[in-house]
């Protein structure tokens, strides 16, 4: 074993040892020349005969071994081998096993088995699995499925045998899949196919196929016989390429199933008719007995690494030896360490077979060359060029580079390997002499910056110094960077990388908090101000957040010192902005605004410049008198003083300061400034200025004409005094349940307190935290009186009393129905008083009330009122057609609930009639029936209302009548509005949005007739109060639509203009810029002819829009055409090698030239007949200037191109490769098989010519006990 990795769940994450080294496979090429082929005797000299030691091949069982029964272990261990050619993950990345490692960890976690992996010399993978039997079997199945390449095969057995393969509840199939590590797919019962598909490894497929055929044979109605034949003699029975057993099956018609070499079974199963089966068994027995007598064995030692050459591709070499010599060659399993190969056959043929075995084993040799792993890439060369030269001369040599190992493995014919080894050793020596490497430590967090965007930095260093730089991936968190190449280049690259890293270590990132409102100002118009900052600090990167993020963080990144300087500079700029953002409002009488502005804005301009402020005046048509000044506080104050002084000079304006306590300012201003505005208007439009809230100042300034100022002052002081006296406050406390009682029904009680005392009583709102607090505000004496009254009421409420009253039992139900709704309302309204009615079933009329004395009395009074209402209750009928009932009720019955509350009545709607459609024809009378018999009198009267239309109202008579009127007012009415039919779809709007909006806005229903009726009448149904508004709204919408129709007709004017198609691209412009400008400027639609349409005139441009606009657009297009017709085109020869430089990155350079000279320059496309021809189009004088300019550029750039090409000749001389001749492979003369060379080539797809038989032999079983 070359390397072993133990995988456990604890250590697996740290396992990065390169368990499966990356193989660098090099395809061999045919040699150009070949010498005469050697003779067979020269290539394979005969070996001296030597007696075989048979004793070593057999191991005697201990005498005591059979007496002791083996103990069955609960934990078992199994070893599986995955050959190189069947490994799924051969090429692993340089940082570990990658996917294979993940898969193994997953298998261990899922199955609970323990895995150990090792790599054999032949690069095969050995996996040892330990654990309980079921865990090992599951792990094995997963390993095969996920780490080994999968093949598939089909086996045909009778359809009726499929169920026996599946077994009860699928158990047999599952067991078979676990045992063979395969996936077996059996067709469904309704599928006529009898093919069973097996997927897995080659060995697993053989085992599964054998087991399926055995199950089928057992169920076969024909005779089945099993014959025990030693495993070693199976190859003789099968014959070379299975021909012998195939002949027997064909001749006898018997199916013979020989276990594959990988299955450790000795019995051969025969299925067929009895007589024919007996013949087949007899023939097989005869062959077996004959071979058992005549054959003998010899054991030879052959290196394990050479076994695969003896086996050959798909066991082909073994079959060849068996065919030519009649000798069976038994190779130990690949997972065995044994190197012993057993030859079994007739004594006289063993010598020849032995010669062939050694010839095949020694036909190839394996050697290695010591070479540091970092030099491997240079030996291989760019795209394998260096190695290709070697493999062209030695095509049979396989060269293998293993990642992480300081050696190169060579495998192939001995002479070729020696020559190749010498060549590679010379290359290694030369590279060691002239190449160097260095490893440097740079913090991994800087690695991605060293690499640069898309590898720009690192690729530049590689190209500049001709070195290879290996940076570990981020996942490794490694700081080690390796530089390889020319010693001088390595040192230069090292110096530059360390300088970059040092610069990055010195770099820092700083977040600066700047209010987002200043970001646009700092950036400036078109980025001018930020460009100045970046020019001042070129090494600092400044990043502003996206405006959508609403972030205040501005990020600075760069060298520490520069970042600090830039931070201070920007902070100073922000401080200036903050200072300059102070704003004050100055009210100035409207008639003086023009004097403040001055002639041509002279006055205001002077104030702005001298005070360094921004002054905004209201628009002329605005009613506002306020002038806003923005800038530094001191400057704003100075500008305000100057503006006020202008106003003072112009008119008799007085200014008075009044001292009013700051706490009264808000109450004087009033809600949204209404109170102070009324004083200002009443006193001739004076200006009253209060100090900023929170400043603590008591000074209020009044400005205006002297007489008005005095009047305003008096009013303001009087109001302040009044507010002062009325702002006395007292807080009292009462339980929240008392509040409703204190307020009284409809606020009656609290209104009495307010009226008698003049004080305001404020109860807490639902969202207030302190629900006990009641606040009284007003004059002191009024507040004290109200406090006294309320405290007396609260004290009475705190005195709980119990009282009773008599209520007729017939009324009890009214109080307790709907879960005592009436009683709950009484309790809420009267301070939580408890009312207890006697139990149902008892005839008692005593009702008990418990609570505060006042509450109890009020509750008794309320109950008495309810009883009186019940006794005075009448029932009224209100006839409203049933179709209007839903509309009358309103959403969720809200309208009816409102009427019930307002009039204290009960309203009951009739049940809905199942079939509301009634025939207008008279009912047909049967013989013997009299008119009206069996019907109610009202039903027989056609004028009487239907039962389903009658709504019952219960309550006091006067309230019932009022409720009836209210109900009738809710009956919807319909009006018809005439709207032209062609406007209906616009009234409805997209997906009904228009009509839905009107219905919601006016609370009506609008019915538009169906399109097929072609009717102009739209019906509006709703409450009479809403109909007028809805009708007016609909007619207004019709007017709007008619105006839009007229506008559409005017906009649809079309105009055609004839323009030569060659000018169309110029009129359209780059990305449609020119034509878009014309469209937007003239508000028109411009349509160019479709190039693919042959029927359409190609010179007609159609313009659609208002007539005046289309004519203006036409004139604009014709002006462009006029300019284009004056233009000329000239071809100029320009060396194609400089085209790219003249065009520039993304065409920037050529666009600059075209804009500068106002010309169009067209370069030839790839594949053009003349690659140097460039066309310049424009006005004659512009074309000449542009041509002169680009010819000067050509001369300048061409000098650089010539120098560069001359340098390339020396740096990269041309490589001349000779023609490669096809390889003939390895050829010898006078070989034993030359006689059969005339036979046709073997068929690779034939299982007979390329079987898997004979590749391995079953391991010998040893008795339990100590090894001897």
UniProtKB/Swiss-Prot annotation:
Alphabetical list of Pfam families matching this protein: KH_1 (PF00013), KH_Vigilin (PF24668)
Residues bearing PTM N-acetylserine: 2
Modified residue annotations for N6-acetyllysine: 991
Q: Where is the composition biased (Basic and acidic residues)?
A: 932-947
Asked if the record carries the keyword Magnesium, the reply is no
Q: Which residues carry this modification: Phosphoserine?
A: 11, 31, 35, 317, 645, 1247, 1252
Q: Where is this region: Disordered?
A: 910-947, 1237-1268
Does the record's keyword annotation contain Ribonucleoprotein?
A: no
Q: Which domain of life is it from?
A: Eukaryota
Q: Which residues carry this modification: Phosphothreonine?
A: 8, 295-296
Q: What does this protein do?
A: Appears to play a role in cell sterol metabolism. It may function to protect cells from over-accumulation of cholesterol.
Put simply, this protein is called Vigilin
């Amino acid at each position: 074993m070359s390397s072993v990795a133990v995988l456990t769940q604890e250590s697996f994450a740290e396992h990065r040892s390169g368990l499966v080294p990356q193989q660098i496979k090099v395809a061999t090429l045919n040699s150009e020349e070949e010498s005469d082929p050697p003779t067979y005797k020269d290539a394979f000299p005969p070996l001296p005969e030597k007696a075989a030691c048979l004793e070593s091949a057999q191991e005697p069982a201990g005498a005591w071994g059979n007496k002791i029964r083996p103990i069955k272990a609960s934990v078992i261990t199994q070893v599986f081998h995955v050959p190189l050619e069947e490994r799924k993950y051969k090429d692993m990345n340089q940082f570990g096993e990658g996917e294979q490692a993940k898969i193994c960890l997953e298998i261990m976690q899922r199955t609970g088995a323990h895995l150990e992996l090792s790599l054999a010399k032949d690069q095969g993978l050995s996996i040892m699995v330990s654990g309980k039997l079921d865990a090992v079997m599951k792990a094995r199945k997963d390993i095969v499925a996920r780490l080994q390449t999968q093949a598939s095969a089909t086996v045909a057995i009778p359809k009726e045998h499929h169920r026996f393969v599946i077994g009860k509840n699928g158990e047999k199939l599952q067991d078979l899949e676990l045992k063979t590590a395969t996936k077996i797919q059996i067709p469904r019962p309704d599928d006529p196919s009898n093919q069973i598909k097996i997927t897995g490894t080659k060995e697993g497929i053989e085992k599964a196929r054998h087991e399926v055929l055995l199950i089928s044979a057992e169920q076969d109605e024909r005779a089945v016989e099993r014959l025990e034949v030693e495993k070693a003699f199976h190859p003789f029975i099968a014959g070379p390429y299975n021909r012998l057993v195939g002949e027997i099956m064909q001749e006898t018609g018997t199916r013979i199933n020989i276990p594959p070499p990988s299955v450790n079974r000795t019995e051969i199963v025969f299925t067929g008719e009895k007589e024919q089966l007996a013949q087949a068994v007899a023939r097989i027995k005869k062959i077996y007995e004959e071979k058992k007598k005549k054959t003998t064995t010899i054991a030879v030692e052959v290196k394990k690494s050479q076994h695969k050459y003896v086996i050959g591709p798909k066991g082909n070499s073994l079959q060849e030896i068996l065919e030519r010599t009649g000798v069976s060659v038994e190779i130990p399993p690949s997972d065995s360490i044994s190197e012993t190969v057993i030859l079994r056959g007739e004594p006289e043929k063993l010598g020849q077979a032995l010669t062939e075995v050694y010839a095949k084993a020694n036909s190839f040799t394996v050697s290695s060359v010591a070479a540091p792993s970092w030099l491997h890439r240079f030996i291989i060369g760019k795209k394998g060029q260096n190695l290709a030269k070697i493999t062209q001369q030695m095509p049979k040599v396989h060269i293998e580079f293993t990642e992480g190992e300081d050696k190169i493995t060579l495998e192939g014919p001995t002479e070729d390997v020696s020559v190749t080894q010498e060549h590679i050793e010379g290359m290694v020596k030369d590279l060691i002499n002239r190449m160097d490497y260095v490893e440097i430590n740079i913090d991994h967090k800087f690695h991605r910056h060293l690499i640069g965007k898309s590898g720009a930095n690192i690729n530049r260093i590689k190209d500049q110094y001709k070195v290879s730089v290996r940076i570990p991936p981020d996942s490794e968190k490694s700081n080690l960077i390796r530089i390889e190449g020319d010693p001088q280049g390595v040192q230069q690259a090292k110096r530059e990388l360390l300088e970059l890293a040092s610069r990055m270590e010195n770099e820092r990132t700083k977040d600066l908090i700047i209010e987002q409102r200043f970001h646009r100002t700092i950036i400036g118009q078109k980025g001018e101000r930020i460009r100045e900052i970046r020019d001042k600090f070129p090494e600092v990167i400044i990043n502003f957040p996206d405006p959508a993020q609403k972030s205040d963080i501005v990020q600075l990144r760069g060298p520490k010192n520069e970042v600090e300087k830039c931070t201070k500079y920007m902070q100073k700029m922000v401080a200036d902005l903050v200072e300059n953002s102070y704003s004050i409002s100055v009210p100035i009488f409207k008639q003086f605004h023009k004097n403040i502005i001055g002639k041509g804005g002279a006055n205001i301009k002077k104030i702005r410049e001298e005070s360094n402020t921004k002054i905004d005046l209201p628009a002329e048509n605005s009613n506002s008198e306020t002038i806003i000044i923005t800038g530094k506080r001191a400057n704003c104050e100075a500008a305000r003083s100057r503006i006020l002084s202008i106003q003072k000079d112009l008119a008799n304006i007085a200014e008075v300061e009044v001292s009013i306590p700051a706490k009264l300012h808000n109450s004087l201003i009033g809600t949204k400034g209404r109170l102070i505005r009324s004083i200002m208007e009443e006193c001739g439009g004076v200006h009253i200025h209060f100090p900023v809230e929170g400043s603590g100042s008591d000074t209020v300034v009044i400005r205006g004409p002297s007489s008005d100022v005095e009047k305003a002052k008096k009013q303001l002081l009087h109001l302040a005094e009044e507010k002062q006296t009325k702002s006395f406050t007292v807080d009292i406390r009462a339980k929240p349940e008392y509040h409703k009682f204190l307020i009284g029904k409809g606020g009656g009680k609290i209104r009495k307190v307010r009226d008698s005392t003049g004080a305001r009583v404020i109860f807490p709102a639902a969202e207030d935290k302190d629900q006990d607090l009641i606040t009284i505000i007003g004059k002191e004496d009024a507040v004290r009186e109200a406090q006294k009254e309320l405290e007396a009421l609260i004290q009475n409420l705190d005195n709980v009393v119990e009282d009773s009253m008599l209520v007729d039992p017939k009324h009890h139900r009214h109080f307790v129905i709907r879960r005592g709704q009436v009683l709950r309302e009484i309790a809420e309204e009267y301070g939580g008083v408890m009312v207890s009615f006697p139990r149902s079933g008892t005839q008692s009329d005593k009702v008990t009330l418990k609570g505060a004395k006042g509450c109890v009395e009020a509750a008794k009074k309320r109950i008495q009122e309810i009883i009186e209402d019940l006794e005075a209750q009448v029932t009224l009928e209100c006839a409203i057609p049933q179709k209007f009932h839903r509309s009358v009720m309103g959403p969720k019955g809200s309208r009816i609930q409102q009427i019930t509350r307002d009039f204290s009545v009960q309203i009951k709607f009739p049940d809905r009639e199942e079939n509301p459609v009634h025939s207008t024809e008279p009912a047909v009378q049967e013989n013997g029936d009299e008119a009206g018999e069996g019907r109610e009198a009202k039903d027989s009267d056609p004028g009487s209302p239907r039962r389903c239309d009658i709504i019952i109202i219960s309550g006091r008579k006067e309230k019932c009548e009022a409720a009836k009127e209210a109900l009738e007012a809710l009956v919807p009415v319909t009006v018809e509005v005439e709207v032209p039919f062609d406007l209906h779809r616009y009234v409805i709007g997209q997906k009904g949005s228009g009509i839905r909006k009107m219905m919601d806005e006016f609370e009506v229903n609008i019915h538009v007739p169906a399109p097929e009726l072609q009717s102009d009448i739209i019906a509006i149904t709703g409450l009479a109060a809403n109909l007028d508004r809805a009708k007016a709204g609909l007619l207004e919408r019709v007017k709007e639509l008619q105006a839009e129709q007229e506008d559409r007709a005017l906009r649809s004017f079309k105009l055609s203009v004839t323009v030569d198609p060659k000018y169309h691209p110029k009129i359209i412009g780059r990305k449609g810029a020119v034509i878009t400008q014309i469209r937007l400027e003239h508000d028109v639609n411009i349509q160019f002819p479709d190039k693919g349409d042959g029927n359409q005139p190609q010179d007609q441009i159609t313009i659609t829009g208002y007539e005046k606009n289309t004519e203006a657009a036409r004139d604009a297009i014709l002006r462009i055409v006029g300019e284009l017709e004056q233009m000329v085109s000239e071809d100029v020869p320009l060396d194609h090698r400089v085209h790219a430089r003249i065009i520039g990155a993304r065409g920037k350079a050529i666009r600059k030239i075209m804009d500068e000279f106002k010309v169009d320059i067209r370069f030839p496309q790839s594949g053009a007949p003349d690659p140097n021809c460039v066309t310049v189009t424009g006005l004659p004088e512009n074309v000449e200037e542009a041509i002169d300019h680009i010819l000067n550029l050509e001369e300048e750039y061409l000098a650089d191109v010539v120098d560069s090409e001359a340098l390339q000749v020396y740096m990269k001389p041309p490589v001349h490769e000779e023609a490669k001749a096809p390889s003939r492979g390895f050829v010898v003369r006078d070989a034993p098989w030359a006689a059969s060379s005339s036979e046709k080539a073997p068929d690779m797809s034939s299982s007979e010519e390329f079987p898997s038989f004979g590749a391995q032999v079953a391991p010998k079983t040893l008795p339990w006990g100590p090894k001897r």
